[in-house]
Regions:
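ATP/Mg2+ or Mg2+-diphosphate-binding catalytic cores
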Residues: 2, 10-14, 131-180
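An alpha-helical support segment within catalytic cores of ATP-dependent transferases
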Residues: 6-48, 58
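Active-site beta-strand-loop-beta-strand hairpin of nuclease catalytic cores
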Residues: 59-63
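Activation of the activation-loop gatekeeper triad in protein kinase-fold domains
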Residues: 67-72
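Active-site activation/catalytic loop segments of kinase-like enzymes and analogous catalytic loops
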Residues: 78-111, 127-142
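Transmembrane helix-bundle signature of multi-pass membrane transporters/permeases
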Residues: 123-124
Length: 180
């Protein structure tokens, strides 16, 4: 998900200057909070598009498989959780509890370090920035394709809210709820 170059290059596809500033804000957060510690984050090939449209469930509503491997990439392992969470938190009234709950479940299968968990919010916001920027780009190419914008409005609402939040405090709360 370290597709910051895509954001830098394509943010001009976003029509609102105010929204472009939101993208720039989260790029700065990434530079300030992720780049200095990036060498300490584990990397692997990840699916990179875990959302409710890409999970196959059986008749008992249990996950049976995943589809859409077109976004697979070698990147930070924490991004797998961040991508899934990005689509869950945008409509959740308590994203901190939801994030902690998902991370605790993930920890049972694939343990993450405290450092990785502490930076997940930056990756959640970055994923949503990529999502809205990609939507702006693709809308120009395929104006009749409504799927392109399926989460765009909710993502912008979440990003605007998170721009006003102390992300370090948010991160500390997630770490505390995950480990205590």
């Amino acid at each position: 998900m370290a597709q910051t170059q895509f954001l830098i290059t394509n943010q001009n596809n976003i029509r609102s200057k105010e929204d472009q500033l939101i993208i720039q804000h989260f790029l700065q957060e990434y530079e300030k909070n992720i780049v200095p510690i990036s060498h300490d984050l584990h990397r692997a090939v990840i699916h990179n598009d875990g959302n409710d449209h890409n999970v196959i469930v059986n008749k008992n509503n249990r996950a049976h498989g995943i589809i859409d491997f077109g976004d697979m990439v070698h990147t930070y392992i924490i991004c797998e959780s961040a991508v899934c969470l990005a689509y869950l938190v945008i409509n959740n009234p308590d994203p901190i509890d939801l994030t902690s709950e998902l991370i605790r479940a993930y920890q049972k299968v694939f343990p993450l370090t405290e450092l990785e968990i502490s930076v997940i919010i930056y990756f959640i916001c970055l994923r949503l920035c990529i999502s809205v920027t990609m939507a702006a780009y693709r809308k120009q190419l395929f104006p009749d394709n409504k799927y392109i914008t399926v989460t765009e409005d909710q993502a912008w609402i979440f990003l605007r809210k998170m721009k006003r939040v102390d992300l370090q405090r948010w991160s500390d709360q997630v770490v505390n709820k995950t480990f205590h």
